[in-house]
A protein has these predicted regions:
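Glycine-rich oxoanion-binding loops at beta->alpha junctions
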Residues: 7-8, 63-119, 128, 169, ...
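N-terminal phosphate-binding or glycine-rich loops at protein starts, especially the Walker A/P-loop
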Residues: 9-66
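Generic secondary-structure signature for well-ordered alpha-helical cores
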Residues: 36-47, 55-58, 62, 94, ...
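C-terminal non-catalytic interaction/assembly regions of soluble proteins
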Residues: 269-419
Length: 419
């Protein structure tokens, strides 16, 4: 009797998936996981067709869809997607207003859902994308339209609540850590006093900058100083520390988050170009490294340069973490399974299992606990002087960058999928 009731609760129809926010080296692996999960559901007669919306909800409103079952007609093609960086379906930065503020948009989306018999909506993204999942799941429920809306996590910032870490972070962390290790080799060839400042992505959370300390796990030297937005940045202490460290190491490497703030709350990166905001209303940051470069030049007087890692942090699939890509695929598959099991208004989570050996399970959390929340680096991962990462922080980060992909090359260049 219970089995019959369960079967009757299954929704039959089409599914749609989209990608939103900043791309990563692993967001396509998550898309591949959704495709694989949807194909399994298709074999069971649950999902008829999986559509991909181009450019997120913007493409959805244009009904700009691609039939992913038809496009990915071989396992080899799906595997190639797993190794392709950026967002193959295209992305957007659109944040939905509330249904009260923009009733027309929601009514149009509901019309499109009904027209295309869409019963499953998967949205791969970060904080603001989870807000879209929250709003759509509530709207569908309030308008008596049976549909499962599931958030699928993605962000190199690693700042989503209710999950141990996020797909895309491990690969970006591997790139940052590797770049730091190689830079340390480069700056060490001269005996002259010099400072190299590397600016890493991270407006509100310093997870990616923290990964700059990972060269120590392979016997290397970590950057001399690491500054995260979770702690106030004191420019006077910064200069004092440089003068102190250069007594033993003339050439210093310093990692900073783009979102570090002065003690008065101002972003260091606002020192250039004034205050600007992006499409989500967040302060647009750039130039923290340049601001500190000028500070060191004026107050220390040694050779100094700043480097902004910028887009390669999230696009470097050639050095992606196998752990990250494997988990990203599993997250996508789990999203489909949870939806087909009747879950809605949730985000798939990665839950670390305790013990000496690293392993994870894939859970689900209420989307209302995640949307618009930010999970920063905890105090126990930052040293007492606020300029380095503790051993506990290293232990958390280290497993996430393990493993390398077997990438397919063509004429010396990695092959990618273009949808």
């Amino acid at each position: 009797m219970l089995e019959r009731k369960y079967k009757m609760s299954i929704l039959y129809g089409n599914a749609v998936v989209g990608q939103s926010g900043g791309p990563t080296a692993a967001i396509n692996a998550t898309l591949a996981g959704v495709i694989r999960g949807a194909l399994d559901a298709h074999e069971k007669g649950i999902i008829k067709t999986l559509y991909g919306m181009r450019n997120g909800v913007e493409g959805f409103l244009r009904e700009d869809f691609v039939d992913l079952f038809s496009f990915f007609d071989s396992d080899e093609k799906i595997t190639l997607l797993e190794h392709t960086p950026s967002a193959a379906l295209g992305s957007c930065r659109r944040k939905l207003k509330s249904h009260v503020e923009d009733a027309e948009t929601y009514a149009k989306m509901l019309e499109i859902f009904k027209k295309n018999d869409i019963r499953y909506f998967f949205y791969i993204g970060g904080n603001d994308s989870m807000d879209t999942v929250l709003k759509l799941s509530q709207y569908a429920s309030n308008h008596d339209y049976e549909m499962k809306v599931v958030g699928v996590p993605k962000t190199v910032d690693n700042d989503l609540a209710c999950t141990d870490h996020t797909p895309g972070f491990g690969s970006a962390a591997k790139y940052v850590a590797t770049t730091m290790k190689e830079l340390l080799c480069d700056i060490s060839v001269y005996s002259l006093k010099a400072v190299t400042i590397v600016e890493v992505m991270g407006r509100d959370a310093g997870w990616l900058t923290a990964s700059a300390a990972l060269p120590v796990i392979s016997g290397g030297r970590a950057p001399d100083l690491v500054y995260l937005p979770e702690r106030p940045f004191d420019p006077d202490k910064f200069i004092d520390k440089i003068n102190e460290l250069q007594k033993d190491h003339p050439a210093l490497l310093i990692a900073i988050s783009e979102g570090i703030k002065f003690p008065d709350g101002r972003y260091v990166g606002e020192g250039l170009g004034g205050r600007k905001v992006d499409a989500f209303g967040h302060v647009a940051l750039s130039g923290a490294g340049k601001v500190l470069e000028e500070l060191v030049k004026d107050r220390v007087g040694c050779k100094v340069r700043s480097i902004e890692l910028n887009l390669p942090q999230r696009a470097a699939a050639h050095i992606a973490s196998l752990t990250d890509i494997t988990e990203s695929v599993s997250v996508g598959k789990a999203a489909v399974k949870y939806a087909c099991d009747g879950k809605t208004g949730i985000m798939v989570t990665i839950d670390r299992v305790g013990g000496d050996d690293y392993s994870v399970t894939f859970g689900a959390a209420d989307i209302s606990k995640i949307a618009n929340a930010v999970r920063g680096v905890p105090d126990e991962y930052i040293n007492e002087s606020s300029d380095g990462i503790t051993e506990e922080g290293i232990r958390y980060l280290a497993p996430l960058i393990v493993g390398e992909l077997n990438i397919k090359y063509l004429n010396g260049m990695p092959e990618h999928v273009v949808i």
